[in-house]
From Swiss-Prot:
GO annotations of cellular component type: chromosome; cytosol
Pfam families recorded: Bac_DNA_binding
Keywords associated with the record: DNA recombination, DNA-binding, Transcription, Transcription regulation, Translation regulation
PROSITE patterns on file: HISTONE_LIKE (PS00045)
Organism: Actinobacillus pleuropneumoniae serotype 5b (strain L20)
Oligomer status and interactors: Heterodimer of an alpha and a beta chain.
Identification of the protein by name: Integration host factor subunit beta
Functional description taken from the UniProt entry: This protein is one of the two subunits of integration host factor, a specific DNA-binding protein that functions in genetic recombination as well as in transcriptional and translational control.
Amino acid sequence: MTKSELIENLVSLNPALQVKSVEDGVKEILEQIMLFLERGERVEVRGFGSFSLHYRQPRVGRNPKTGESVKLDAKYVPHFKAGKDLKERVDLV
């Protein structure tokens, strides 16, 4: 599902809402998550999951085309950990 599809789905479930309002709401939620992560803070949505940053050590990588070694700097990458409720709902077995 894309962001546009999410917005369309929310509007179809709530016909009283304007598309622009839903779009602004979804964008603002995502923006707030990104702002907190930029500040190095963890974001937790109970039952859904949490967003945090994981540190990646500097390492030597390899260019797949040339085979040449490439030095990769250390960096922080976003990480999502699913919450208990989400895990239970998607367990299809």
